[in-house]
Amino acid sequence: MTTKKSAEVLVYPIFTVRWLAIHGIAVPTIFFLGAITAMQFIQR
């Protein structure tokens, strides 16, 4: 708890599994939400 470096070593190695799980869901979700909201404004 004295240095920030020891905390960063414990916090940051979770970059592969959690990062892929979050972005594997979040990136297509944001893309489809943007596509659906864009479709609302298309006039025929």
From Swiss-Prot:
One record GO biological process: photosynthetic electron transport chain
Keywords recorded for this protein, A-Z: Chloroplast, Electron transport, Heme, Iron, Membrane, Metal-binding, Photosynthesis, Photosystem II, Plastid, Thylakoid, Transmembrane, Transmembrane helix, Transport
Pfam family of the protein (one): Cytochrom_B559
Membrane topology type: Single-pass membrane protein
Main subcellular location: plastid
Obligatory cofactor(s): heme b
Co-factor remark: With its partner (PsbE) binds heme. PSII binds additional chlorophylls, carotenoids and specific lipids.
Residue spans crossing the bilayer: 19-35
Chain sites annotated for binding heme: H23
PROSITE patterns attached to this UniProt entry: CYTOCHROME_B559
GO molecular function, one term: electron transfer activity
Compartment annotation: Plastid, Chloroplast thylakoid membrane
Phosphoprotein as UniProt keyword: no
GO cellular component: chloroplast thylakoid membrane; photosystem II reaction center
KW Heme (keyword) present: yes
Superkingdom: Eukaryota
Oligomeric form and interacting partners: Heterodimer of an alpha subunit and a beta subunit. PSII is composed of 1 copy each of membrane proteins PsbA, PsbB, PsbC, PsbD, PsbE, PsbF, PsbH, PsbI, PsbJ, PsbK, PsbL, PsbM, PsbT, PsbX, PsbY, PsbZ, Psb30/Ycf12, at least 3 peripheral proteins of the oxygen-evolving complex and a large number of cofactors. It forms dimeric complexes.
NCBIfam families: cyt_b559_beta
Its job: This b-type cytochrome is tightly associated with the reaction center of photosystem II (PSII). PSII is a light-driven water:plastoquinone oxidoreductase that uses light energy to abstract electrons from H(2)O, generating O(2) and a proton gradient subsequently used for ATP formation. It consists of a core antenna complex that captures photons, and an electron transfer chain that converts photonic excitation into a charge separation.
Family the entry assigns: Belongs to the PsbE/PsbF family.
Protein name, UniProt field: Cytochrome b559 subunit beta
Organism name: Chlamydomonas reinhardtii
Lineage summary: Eukaryota, Viridiplantae, Chlorophyta, core chlorophytes, Chlorophyceae
Gene: psbF
